[in-house]
């Protein structure tokens, strides 16, 4: 049986909301420096590969790598773009063979604990002048998530759902500034 607290990634279900998911990633890409000329790009938590493929189109001379923990997502990514190096692994212990010029992490790092250790480690994986581009959603703080938590805690399903709730380990923005400065 699968662990109910561990997210299961279904590429078909994930694709149903592709436009909504892509919006934040595209905004993040648009914030990358215009003069960025990376040789090594890593997309951490690449899922089905759309963002890594866009990064490869934007930087065709770069070696692009996509890292994800889901074999099903990586299978979909490989079908999308065989020229990208797709790697199954865990962001929490990931270390690149070569320093990265761009580490792109859209909606992936909020799943991981211990940002006090994770973020400095990601910065250490960058080449001099490299860019760490991160977007983490704050969905858990919205009203609809509060209603979902309330509903999950009541009714005949409450016992089956106990222990499943997970609050992302996000820090105060000022603390991220301190870690990255």
Set out the residue ranges of the language-model regions.
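Class I SAM-dependent methyltransferase Rossmann-like catalytic core
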Residues: 4-21
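Conserved alpha-helix/loop element of class I SAM-dependent methyltransferases that forms part
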Residues: 20-39, 54
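Short glycine-centered segments of the SAM/dcSAM-binding site in methyltransferase folds
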Residues: 40, 130-131
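Class I SAM-dependent methyltransferase SAM/SAH-binding core
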Residues: 40-94
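A short acidic, Gly/Pro-enriched loop at the edge of an enzyme's catalytic core
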Residues: 95-103
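A short SAM/SAH-binding and catalytic strip from SAM-dependent methyltransferases
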Residues: 102-115, 138
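Helix-to-beta-strand junctions that scaffold the AdoMet/dcAdoMet cofactor pocket
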Residues: 112-113, 126-128
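Conserved catalytic/acceptor-binding region of the Class I
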Residues: 116, 131-181
């Amino acid at each position: 049986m699968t662990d109910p607290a561990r997210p299961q990634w279904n590429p078909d279900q994930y694709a149903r909301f592709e436009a909504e998911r892509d919006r934040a990633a595209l905004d993040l890409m648009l914030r990358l420096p215009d003069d960025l000329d990376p040789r090594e790009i890593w997309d951490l938590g690449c899922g089905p590969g759309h963002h890594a493929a866009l990064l490869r189109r934007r930087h065709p001379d770069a070696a692009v790598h996509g890292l994800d923990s889901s074999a099903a997502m990586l299978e979909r990514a490989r079908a999308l773009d065989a020229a990208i190096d797709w790697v199954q692994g865990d962001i929490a212990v990931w270390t690149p063979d070569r320093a990265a010029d761009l580490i792109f992490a859209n909606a992936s790092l909020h799943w991981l604990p211990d940002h006090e250790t994770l973020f400095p480690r990601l910065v250490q994986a960058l080449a001099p002048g490299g860019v760490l581009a991160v977007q983490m959603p704050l969905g858990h703080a919205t009203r609809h998530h509060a209603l979902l938590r309330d509903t999950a805690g009541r009714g005949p399903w409450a016992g089956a759902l106990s222990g499943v709730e997970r609050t992302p380990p996000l820090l105060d923005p000022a603390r991220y500034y301190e870690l990255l400065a």
